[in-house]
Regions:
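N-terminal helix-turn-helix DNA-binding core of bacterial DNA-binding proteins
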Residues: 16-59
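Short, locally clustered residues in the helix-turn-helix/winged-helix DNA-binding domain
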Residues: 8, 36-40, 101, 128
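Exposed, interaction-prone assembly regions rather than primary DNA-binding/catalytic cores
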Residues: 121-142
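A structural signal for well-ordered alpha-helices, especially hydrophobic packing surfaces
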Residues: 11, 97, 131-134
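N-terminal leader segment of winged-helix/HTH proteins
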Residues: 1-25, 72, 141
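Charged, amphipathic alpha-helical coiled-coil/dimerization segments
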Residues: 15, 65-128
Length: 142
């Protein structure tokens, strides 16, 4: 039960911490990863986000709509498939993305504080394996 407890504690408090750091930029812990990906891959298909982030499709639709409403991204129809959209960052998003990336890097450093580089690598390997174990059990393959 200790593993579940500390996964829960870490998840809850890193999100609170990240929300405080991201607040001046008008985004939160559920939006930053989408914004980073869209800024780094302009024209990315909305549907491709599903395979990257292991979230429910409704979360993607809601987050994309919120980012668009906030003036962070624009949507453009996909000429090859009208059922999906291409996503592009706005100038506003591009002007803050480096700071957001830095906040994420500092948050990761905080979480890994006190671990050697080899311990950090092992921790990441173990965390990835745990994630694969649970997604495989739930038959979520990406």
């Amino acid at each position: 039960m200790q593993l579940l407890k500390w996964l829960s504690v870490t998840d809850r408090f890193y999100k609170i911490y990240l929300d405080k750091q991201l607040a001046p930029y008008g985004i939160n812990n559920s939006q930053y990863m989408f914004l980073i990906k869209i800024c780094r891959s302009p024209g990315i298909l909305q549907d491709s986000l599903l395979n990257m982030f292991y979230v429910h499709p409704s979360n993607i639709v809601r987050t994309v709509a919120t980012l668009e409403k906030q003036g962070m991204i624009t949507r453009s129809p996909n000429d090859k498939d009208k059922r999906t959209c291409k996503l592009y960052p706005t100038e506003r998003a591009l002007s803050i993305i480096d700071e957001i990336q830095m906040i994420c890097e500092k948050t990761e450093a905080l979480l890994l504080q006190g671990m050697s580089e080899s311990e950090q690598n092992l921790f990441m390997d173990f965390l990835i394996q745990a994630g694969r174990n649970i997604t495989s059990e739930l038959h979520i393959e990406r």
